[in-house]
Amino acid sequence: MGGSNPVADLIADKGWCVADGATGSNFFGRGLEAGYPPELWCLEKPEEVAAVHDAFLHAGADLFLTNSFGGNALRLKLHASEHRVAELNIAAAQLASEATQRHFATTGRKTLVAGSIGPTGELFVPMGMLDHRQAVEVFREQAMALAEGGADVLWIETMSSTEEVAAATEAAKTTGLPVCATLSFDTARCSMMGVTPMDFAQFAVDIELDMLGSNCGIGPAELLDSTQGIVASGIALPVVAKGNCGIPQYMDGAIHFHGSPDLMAQYALFARDV
């Protein structure tokens, strides 16, 4: 595990840590076209990225994610941008770090930057072609850039397999920053690759994660169920519950969720008290 963990320190002080909302969904509202990689906005439209960060901080987020979810070489290769991993992730972390500085200057409240690391989109051997060594190198390139840009923690998210979590965690640890990893669980109480919340809790201990939890999924109720499964394992690490506001639907040229702000506020209180 890493040394100092600012998220754990914040939880010890406040009792909880409030994270941000849906970065991608907010970008759609600002003109991002479906299929276009939001990571490129870190350099093309930094003012839009900064505005979303500022809005989350103004809403009370203690921690927020960088605009780098798909910022690894394998994902960026789909857009002929695999050679831009370093510059895009450094920019993502710098934009977020600058937002924390602006917020502190006006409010005196300290907030944290979580360097978002999403999945590669590839299957691991024997089901696919990606092996552990290759995956570690892909994730290391991104993790090092996020650390260089000023991330406080590295946030591995929306994973489905322990193999990919292991590779991303190994890579992230080379930075010396605290590492969080979250899986996405479905209605069967397991990830797409069959990992249960309790399995994941034990795995998190085995690979010495600093934080773990669940994110995304199909809605807050199901996410709370996964969170309870992790907590029931008796794990002593900070537990993350960061769900969708329901199932996203494409309507009238935009992404909509069937949940509401009130629903998410209630879910946040339930998650705090699990």
Please state what every model-predicted region is.
Residues 1-274:
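Domain-level signal for soluble alpha/beta catalytic cores
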